[in-house]
UniProtKB/Swiss-Prot annotation:
Annotated TM spans: 121-142, 156-177, 185-205, 218-238, 368-390, 396-415, 692-711, 717-735
Taxonomy, superkingdom: Bacteria
GO biological process: nitrogen fixation
Family of the protein in this entry: Belongs to the cation transport ATPase (P-type) (TC 3.A.3) family. Type IB subfamily.
Binding site for Mg(2+): D637, D641
EC nos: 7.2.2.-
Protein name: Nitrogen fixation protein FixI
Keywords: ATP-binding, Cell membrane, Magnesium, Membrane, Metal-binding, Nitrogen fixation, Nucleotide-binding, Phosphoprotein, Translocase, Transmembrane, Transmembrane helix
InterPro entries membership: ATPase_P-typ_cyto_dom_N, ATPase_P-typ_P_site, ATPase_P-typ_TM_dom_sf, ATPase_P-typ_transduc_dom_A_sf, HAD-like_sf, HAD_sf, Heavy-metal-associated_CS, HMA_dom
Amino acid sequence: MSCCTMDAESVLALSTTSFSAEEVRLASQPLGEGLRQLDLSVSDVHCGGCISTIERALLTLPFVKTARVNLTARRVTCVYQEEIEARATDPSKILGEINSAGYRAHLFTPSAPESDKTRNQLLLAIGVSGFAAPNIMLLSVSVWSGADAATRDMFHWISAMIAAPALVYAGRFFFKSAWNALRHGRTNMDVPISVTVSLSYAVSLWETVHHGEHAWFDASVSLLFFLLIGRTLDHIMREKARAAINGLARLAPRGALLINPDGSRRYIAVEEIAAGDEISIAAGERVPVDGIVVSGESDLDLSIVTGESSPVTVASDSEVSSGAMNLTGSLVLRATRIAKNSLLSEIIGLMEAAEGGRARYRRIADRAATLYSPVVHLLALVSFLAWGFLGGDWKQAMLVAVAVLIITCPCALGLAVPVVQVVAAGELFRKGIMVKDGSALERLAETDTVAFDKTGTLTMGSSRLVRVDAMDESAAAIARGLAAHSRHPLSRALVRDTETAPISFDRVTEIPGGGLEARNGADIYRLGNAAFACGTSFVPRTADSPFSEVVLSKNGVDLARFFFDDTLRPGACEAIDRLDAAGLETLIVSGDRQTVVDNTAHALGIDRALGSLTPKQKVEECQRLNGEGRRVLMVGDGINDAPALAAAHVSMAPATASDIGRQAADLVFFIDRLDAVPEAIAVARRSASLIRQNFALAIGYNVLAVPIAIAGLATPLIAAVAMSTSSIIVVTNALRLNGFGKRPDMHIRRGIGRSAEVKAA
């Protein structure tokens, strides 16, 4: 129900903002085959009517191939031809066409997120209308109770003075939107709302001036109060969807140390890095752009790229991607891509594309709303004319028309979905699950396939020592003494999971990409990967093993081998059982090695497991399933899962996930147990049932109430009471969801079988 608004500053900008064709062409990106993509920011896009208006306007340009509006990002993505019949096209016309449609467009540039002023304004408007409505109602009670004429007139004037500023301040969202739509030859949901509120106040003021017995100031203010609640909920939930992309953008480094050809170094912004530039990356810094290692050796956290739970060693000629964290040594990197074409930018683009796809759910509702507006106006007009010409009482005709407009106000319809979402979100929160996206529950109820990431989702994401093959009794003590000097995940797991008292070393050196080295007299001890500890001729045992291996050596001869795996998340087995029992298909999509993924799938009884997937391949798998008509719930935790979380029909992440993973997900569960997934699906299905009931109640109310209003049997006051009552009924029905989890018959059937204690080993 959110619609277009424009202020005077925006209107002025339409006539002053201009870009040359060359500026626009430089701001767009080549796609090949003579096509370019242009991204534009359009801040005043708010509803499905805005989307269809802009897209239709752009597609009238002969050189525009596709146009898509992302409602969440308030961005327009346009693909256009560079040439038509050997003549260059003018892409600046794209901005002009958007401006002509009544919207302010400018070239998109990433920037830090600003505070949500619209949300604050909406909350303040709710407070103003919420203060005015009950106070006017209290005055109305005295009038209804039979106050004398002088007291009645005084109360009416007081009500008028309270209602006027409330209507001006709280109603400006609807009035501006309605005016903007009408002056461009369109209607939207705010048009009948604005007409209803204005007519109700005008008729009430007329009655007050002429000492009438009744006034309906409370009706107009109450309408605004209920409608603003629905609009605010919609706005808050939509803006939360942007948090993931903002967080991912903050992950990218802002600058890098450039190595000049003469060997000197200077710090430059990431945007200034060109392909072929050499940059220095110290330990603890993130890789700013995609590139190839020129010199140096280090361990990188590549979780953003592959989802690997363990750091990966890189050396000369290794390819690295932007966003990876350099853990140990210094590197010199030759850039192969500029920042806007790097992996991080690609992930952000994938997430925005997925969010744009979600807008179709809102479009369906807004398209229905475009039909509602003219029908309501026509109904009120016909009622007015019929009563005026047939009855001859034009005052009564006006009251009937106002009553029809009030009684058909979409308050109940507007609250049918958001109120259930809020109650369901509260119920899930009590279960340790947070809902972040307004449409997430609706989409979760439609789920028929659940795709899990492995590391950090099905498992806890922390390494666990599972086996030690020692050739020397003191090996564990030596290894623990060495491992205590490193923050490597496997070193920490070794220290945590061994109980032997460590042997102390005076000096321990950490070799980037290799491991730890220490001397004890004439002996050299090494702990790390096989090649580092024993030389390149040593053959590790992890090639086809589900375990990670660390080798301890003395003077190049192995003393012990330590094997690590990941622990299954508590409740993982029960969760898979319950999902299977509910008829949902389960699969694993992971960046880990296929052998490791297969091992976890076998432990959980999951038939389909895909390993060694990149973020893009995870997205493609979700899209493939969507193409087959499946409704995919993606459950993941890593930064590399963020695009798939955004591309899936709906997504969940544990609270232990990366910041980006949590922000990209529609739902986040704070409990350690994985049975939060079937719990959430159970509540979502129940809430979907209540939403359908609320729609039935709201439609049933209109079917019964509209004929009564047309017949003149309902005054504007009665119409306002009926409208409020319908809203209360809808809210009360939604509250039935409270305590849902306490009724065992509502739960997804629990599977019987494997114990939660089954391990991944």
